[in-house]
Amino acid sequence: MGANSSSISELPDNEYLKKLSGAEPISENDPFWNQLLSFSFTTPTNSADLKLLEEATVSVCKSLVEKNPRTGNLGSLIKVFLSRTKELKISAECQNHLFIWQAHNALFIICCLLKVFISRMSEEELQLHFTYEDKTPGSYGTECEDLIEELLCCLIQLIVEIPLLDITYSISLEAVTTLIVFLSCQLFHKEILRESLIHKYLMRGRCLPYTSRLVKTLLYNFIRQERSPPPGSHVFQQQTDGGGLLYGIASGVATGLWTVFTLGGVGSKATPQLDQCSPLANQSLLLLLVLANLTDAPDTPNPYRQAIMSFKNTQDSSAFSSSHPHVFQINFNSLYTALCEQQKSDQATLLLYMLLHQNGNVRTYVLARTDIENLVLPILEILYHVEERNSHHVYMALIILLILTEDDGFNRSIHEVILKNITWYAERVLTEISLGSLLILVVIRTIQYNMTRTRDKYLHTNCLAALANMSAQFRSLHQYAAQRIISLFSLLSKKHNKVLEQATQSLRGSLDSNDSPLPDYAQDLNVIEEVIRMMLEIINSCLTNSLHHNPNLVYALLYKRDLFEQFRTHPSFQDIMQNIDLVISFFSSRLEHAGAELSVERVLEIIKQGAVALPKDRLRKFPELKFKYVEEEQPEEFFIPYVWSLVYNAAVALYWNPRDIQLFTMDSG
């Protein structure tokens, strides 16, 4: 590096990097370090520059891998960085730009080297490079482990203790990035790592006491969304003489958004590059998700997950429980606001899911909010644009709704919140609709999309479970929401008839031919009948619990009464059809007595009058529909690849060669 580097492409020939990776040991006190660390640059963020930087770093690393066991220069560089960080807090308070600048540059080089080392060697090999012992070969173990632990601990201290100012923003970001890089060994393993060396250091020993402070700081970084300092307030001034590391590189390198690779199993579309004006917030959230999803050690639960599960509101004055060792307090109002504002990203939705599912304090607070629409509307928008989202993002949004609908208070309150002009809902102009009716519309639309495209049973199940949880509390359903409920049933009915016909034809064909195996129409029929049963239970639940609140649903039911005829005598639906049949018969009779040519308004009036007169004791009682979200066994098999796919796609200034990734599959098509 040094003051004379002018472009990434020149890095392999840079005299300072050649010396660092050369055959000559460099002591920690050598003036060389001041020369190496005196460079000015803007960290690259586009794909072309990042790929160039990676390739240049690989070239330097090859030499360093070969020579470092004899020179110990990597260890010396790390010790130089460690010695400089001891005075960082004072430097920040005293506005010592030069000191912070050089400390940042040291960490940037360490991070670049580490990223290549970790992608190309085992943890055992990595350990060997963290020490140099000239006297007694084989005695490296303790010292190298201590140096790794010391660096990890130093990075955590830097994140939690250094005040976030314009001059410290970049080094704080680099510290978060380096911790992500330390944990990135998972990317290069197909199986989930359960006993990683780095995990061990982060979960016990010197790092452990910082657990709650680290989680709290990362959360506050996400909450505050601090923007990257503007050029000019930054410690790294761009040199006007062309001496800056990346000066003039745009003329020789094609720039543009990072080409994001589609992840098999993570989505069918590439995730768009997100607005990276708050890189520290983005990177902090990604690190938090990685830490929270580390697997438990055999004898120790993941302390970062414990901290996520147990933190409390700053307004909560109750004593900390001794059963939660990593409790801290955070401003829930600020957290709620940030969660509402950031739901366009997968990682913010995943954080919301984790907090609602794992932290009872957060869940209770969210459900008590009187502005719940600020949280629910962004989630509904994710589901509405299902074709633009990867499947994991849709699942997380859906499970969040399912968790919320487990609460009766939520199911009541959403029908009291009236919304005006939902501009993103394109199928129909909705000038005024309750949040509850909009939620029903979006969930039904998701089911219909799934029926025609992905045919994912898991998605169906969660959509229907959310509707079922809400059904007893349906209130004043919008006429369009009521129509869509019955339209969905109509679609299911047609699908049932089609599958039934295919099954019948298949059975006839099997009697005439013994050749190829036939499609399993019986299983298809079973699945569609399960979904129909669930829809009938949802309609029945609304009719038995809140018929008088929902004239529009009764109207839609009567308008399409012929749909239900075929299911009256079906053995799978006879019991649940009794109430629906009774309601249809009761109101049909009243409408017939009222005469022909009735207006919509008159029909609704008759329905409202009839709802009061309908003898409730004639409606058969069924168990209340209640579904609870339960995380599957070994959730890490889902969440760890998902989290790392988010890191791969959304991390700022981090590039990994897609050919090296083992944890998830790449699909460029």
From Swiss-Prot:
Highest rank taxon of the organism: Eukaryota
Protein localization: Cytoplasm; Golgi apparatus
Residue positions bearing lipid (N-myristoyl glycine): G2
GO cellular component entries: Golgi apparatus
Post-translational modification, as annotated: Myristoylated in vitro; myristoylation is not essential for protein targeting to Golgi compartment.
InterPro entries xref list: Dymeclin (IPR019142)
Gene Ontology biological process terms in this record: Golgi organization
Keyword Lipoprotein: yes
Keyword Oxidoreductase: no
Keyword entries, A-Z: Cytoplasm, Golgi apparatus, Lipoprotein, Myristate
Disulphide-bonded residues: none
Pfam family membership, one: Dymeclin
Function of the molecule: Necessary for correct organization of Golgi apparatus.
Protein family (similarity comment): Belongs to the dymeclin family.
Name of this chain's protein: Dymeclin
Organism listed in the record: Gallus gallus
